[in-house]
Amino acid sequence: MEEAHLLSAADVLRRFSVTAEGGLTLEQVTDARERYGPNELPTEEGKSLWELVVEQFEDLLVRILLLAALVSFVLAWFEEGEETTTAFVEPLVIMLILVANAIVGVWQERNAESAIEALKEYEPEMGKVIRSDRKGVQRIRARDIVPGDIVEVAVGDKVPADLRLIEIKSTTLRVDQSILTGESVSVTKHTDAIPDPRAVNQDKKNMLFSGTNIASGKALGVAVATGLHTELGKIRSQMAAVEPERTPLQRKLDEFGRQLSHAISVICVAVWVINIGHFADPAHGGSWLRGAVYYFKIAVALAVAAIPEGLPAVITTCLALGTRRMARKNAIVRSLPSVETLGCTSVICSDKTGTLTTNQMSVCRMFVVAEAEAGACRLHEFTISGTTYTPEGEVRQGEQLVRCGQFDGLVELATICALCNDSALDYNEAKGVYEKVGEATETALTCLVEKMNVFDTDLKGLSRVERAGACNSVIKQLMQKEFTLEFSRDRKSMSVYCTPTRADPKAQGSKMFVKGAPESVIERCSSVRVGSRTVPLSATSREHILAKIRDWGSGSHTLRCLALATRDTPPRKEDMQLDDCSQFVQYETGLTFVGCVGMLDPPRPEVAACITRCSRAGIRVVMITGDNKGTAVAICRRLGIFGDTEDVLGKAYTGREFDDLSPEQQRQACRTARCFARVEPAHKSRIVENLQSFNEITAMTGDGVNDAPALKKAEIGIAMGSGTAVAKSAAEMVLSDDNFASIVAAVEEGRAIYNNMKQFIRYLISSNVGEVVCIFLTAILGLPEALIPVQLLWVNLVTDGLPATALGFNPPDLDIMEKLPRNPREALISGWLFFRYLAIGVYVGLATVAAATWWFLYDAEGPQVTFHQLRNFLKCSEDNPLFAGIDCEVFESRFPTTMALSVLVTIEMCNALNSVSENQSLLRMPPWLNPWLLGAVVMSMALHFLILLVPPLPLIFQVTPLSGRQWGVVLQMSLPVILLDEALKYLSRHHVDEKKDLK
């Protein structure tokens, strides 16, 4: 039943044709079950393992590799002679890469689907209902509850369905619904109708929501929604409807794959077509078909050369290393690609409570009355330092440090705070922090008493555990709490009845200590405490006190104020009717006003500086909270989200104000707003959608079940470490310390990772360009193969893979958080950069072909043929006069391929050293700034020597050891690449970047 909160309890019962005493009949239960189904959330129908495996092969790069592997496998079957074994190495290695990538992909997908399943932990196993088939309350399985059932809940129970309250059987009913609404304190419920069709869940005080917990009290309610129709069920439906977006990096790699596939197709076809005239050469036995197959193999080698096979592994490694660095900064990343996405975050939508603030309610101001004569009223005002539950802080009057024991009013105020209180401080030795036991508001008062130390208790030498309650203990030794008159909605206050512990004739008698909403408490005060005297409360004094409280409760302060009072001569406890809560208000009249405290959930000290950093980095911070607008705007001003006098019109909205806007106005509001107050989870999702329509990359924080859909929808969902399992499962990142500063640190890390990723992607691609140029050139010129597929795989995966991974450790730029967020649609390689890496790649290809050609033409150990003979090597035969005196087998020697491979590897090592910085010279940013890179270069060269010297690797890779003279030629051809890149960097710094700055 929608909008049950609008109806009276009697109307709701009438709609379901049920009575609170009798409950549903078995017939009604059967009908309702058929109509509404079981009261449970359906299990997530995840993708089958086979579907997940198939998905991993939808990537274009992967499909090209798969095709290359299959073709290589077929060609390997037709190999003859000693190449029969080595021919299978290439397809097997490619298949291993694909299988490994698929396993990682499937594992990540399986992990990501757990968010919806985690919702089920909030479903209780059992429920208590009243039905006509049995007298009294009966326990049944929660899944069997149907709309119309009369359900009983009591303290400690998990609510089994959405209920409309019909009767509260205790003084009050308090419910912890933080998982659903994000409210940090438990909520007092009632049974009255709420005539507001647009009330948000926080305002539906006559409703209990499935999955929330009863904090205190006992009540009856009628089930108005079950299963997917509950608020929890709606969240499940929203989560199921959210399709995961591909990250900017994934989209870029997809685009890169498309471009690469087109380029590969064109080049492969071109190589094959250009050589049609050579298909019938003698080297192929005069068989046109054999010649066609030979050049087809070269085309396949080209495909293998063009694809950076090591790229997926290097990216995964770099992101994994990034997650480790982030974890040290309290940001635990669950989804690897989101590490890079953090780097282009342009908007951070942050919860207020616990993220921007400490979620540790603290008293920061208090006052007692200094003078209350007929026409004048003067107050003693104090400020208190400290923003956490740590019982340390200073009490000041103006700039002056004060000893609270010197003010009689403060001694009495501390006494009320300590005794009219059911909370305590506890020192958590494992975490090394003080924590609350009980309600946040009351814990703030407990902490205040410790800071005030009105009896000058000696606190030296106390352990932290003892320090947690030392000053409160002293007060509690003087008075004994007899009983508590619980808080109720009508009187907005609570009180305790205390008697002195010492039977001293001079000791004061029994007292009632009262705390509550200032207007309500002061209305029942007839006098005011001035020092140790009791003075009648005049209209002037009353108005002066209320004006001060109104000032604290609004504007830039926006404190939550509590009035503290006593009843000096209460009735005898024997004469009080404690079972009738309607009498409580009479016992709490004729009060003496003692003082007032103002508290707030204080901003985290480090957050203001982080918001300034975000502003400099071009990142907009938006506060989203369930709190009221006044409090939210005040906190925004304290944090620097708004200026002290800034007009917030059009920049701060409540959920209701946002709903009143047209869809286009909502879009524009999301573009300019920096504060959303009194919002529901659905608003968060709409805010994310609107921001995404402007191509903003949004980071959204959340901790409750209600936040899960928005966390899943945002590019970066950030859950709190103290949040629910559902939120953590839906998020890409979890903050172990719940601190906004950790988000900013993670964004900085994300930017650094992206910069490093650009370096190694470009490094790998320039290598691939070189390999393509090499094979293309040999095919066009009709030269013998300089590099074979298995060698290309070795270079792409191992030799290049190690330095590429080490580039992930490059130090970040010092001005990384001074730049605007990069455009997520900006290409990895474009314009000038494309030319740069093409130039390097062409040099790599030319040098590689030159090395192989040098051996044939000039090496003393080589055949020293002419270039014309080399170009026509396929026509070599004993009866061809062009090749008189030349052994045709020399054209299949391993020396030229070894020379080419050695030049390729050495140039790539020089390239890696060049990649420490995109534009800075090696003289400004030398390679030893990244010691990991130096280690990787040494390791890669060691592996290269390994395949040259250690059997059976030379056979597998078709290589042979080189002489010292040959290594000299390799270095002569390789080292100029450093000079070429330095020249290109110089042009970048002095011409290309300057033009960008002028623009």
From Swiss-Prot:
Binding-site residues, Ca(2+) 2: 304-305, 307, 309, 796, 800
Membrane-spanning parts: 49-69, 90-110, 254-273, 296-313, 758-777, 788-808, 829-851, 898-917, 931-949, 965-985
EC number: 7.2.2.10
CDD domains on file: P-type_ATPase_SERCA
Keyword Phosphoprotein in annotation: yes
Database matches in Pfam families: Cation_ATPase, Cation_ATPase_C, Cation_ATPase_N, E1-E2_ATPase, Hydrolase
Summary of the tissues where the protein is detected: Found in most tissues. Most abundant in large and small intestine, spleen and lung. Also detected in PC12 cells.
Region (Interaction with phospholamban 2): 788-808
Modified residues (N-acetylmethionine): 1
PANTHER family: CALCIUM-TRANSPORTING ATPASE
Protein name: Sarcoplasmic/endoplasmic reticulum calcium ATPase 3
Natural source organism: Rattus norvegicus
Lineage, opening ranks: Eukaryota, Metazoa, Chordata, Craniata, Vertebrata
Gene name of the record: Atp2a3
